């Protein structure tokens, strides 16, 4: 189903990019790995820039980042950079300091370059009428085991019929997300995505079905899939 853009809705996007990607075993951050002619981060930003509702992108960078300003996309008037933090939550809060009249904010991983325009549009079109926001996600297909942390023996199997893999982007009202993230920091709670902050504060974001191709590049083998999916996206 083709959904229609909503040009009057203003959204800012925050892309946390302060990580250094230890699991890739590189001497530079993985978002700057090149696939064909572009870095992973450039692919990520180009998809966000292609949507008419996204009026500004804020990239949260590591204090020692000396790669971003060398990218041509960094000179786009809609792209800003700020200093990120040691944890993802601090990088997102840094991005929320930017002055804007937008009421909504999208958070998207720097290393998810295979996001399709249609998934982005679906998230915005479906979520914009909620008061809480929503996320892209995929149903869990594998059998999930809960283990003993120490010796890794299986304790039990978790029913998967209501389990989802959380993806990004995630879209929320700006003021609500800011409030929930600050509450998480105050209470010293560990979270791995922004939706978890809303859940902690008693809110229930919507799930919007996303593509399995929207992978997060974490390990070297992920680059093979990313190159294949990007080739498909660019062809379309």
From Swiss-Prot:
It catalyses: 2-C-methyl-D-erythritol 4-phosphate + CTP + H(+) = 4-CDP-2-C-methyl-D-erythritol + diphosphate. This is 2-C-methyl-D-erythritol 4-phosphate cytidylyltransferase. Catalyzes the formation of 4-diphosphocytidyl-2-C-methyl-D-erythritol from CTP and 2-C-methyl-D-erythritol 4-phosphate (MEP). The keyword Transferase applies. The record marks 160, 216 as: Positions MEP for the nucleophilic attack. GO terms for molecular function: 2-C-methyl-D-erythritol 4-phosphate cytidylyltransferase activity. Homodimer.
């Amino acid at each position: 189903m083709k959904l229609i853009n909503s040009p009057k809705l203003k959204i800012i996007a925050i892309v946390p990019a302060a990580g250094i990607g230890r699991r890739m075993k590189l001497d530079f951050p993985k978002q700057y790995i090149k696939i064909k002619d572009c870095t992973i981060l450039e692919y990520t930003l180009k998809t966000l820039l292609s949507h008419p509702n996204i009026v500004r992108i804020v990239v949260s960078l590591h204090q020692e980042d000396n790669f971003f300003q060398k990218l041509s996309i960094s000179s786009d008037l809609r792209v800003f950079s700020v200093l990120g933090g040691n944890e993802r939550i601090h990088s997102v809060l840094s991005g929320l300091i930017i002055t804007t009249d937008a009421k909504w904010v999208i958070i998207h991983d720097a290393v998810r370059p295979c996001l399709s325009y249609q998934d982005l549009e679906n998230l915005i079109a479906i979520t914009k009428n909620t008061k809480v926001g929503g996320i892209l996600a995929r149903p869990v297909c594998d059998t999930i085991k809960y283990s003993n942390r120490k010796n890794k023996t299986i304790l039990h199997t978790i029913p998967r019929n209501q389990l989802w893999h959380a993806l990004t982007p995630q879209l929320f009202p700006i003021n609500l997300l800011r409030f929930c993230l600050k509450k998480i920091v105050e209470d010293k709670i560990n979270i791995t995505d922004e939706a978890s902050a809303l859940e902690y504060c008693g809110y229930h974001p919507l799930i919007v079905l996303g593509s399995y191709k929207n992978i997060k590049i974490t390990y070297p083998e992920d680059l093979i899939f990313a190159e294949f999916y990007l080739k498909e996206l660019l062809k379309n």
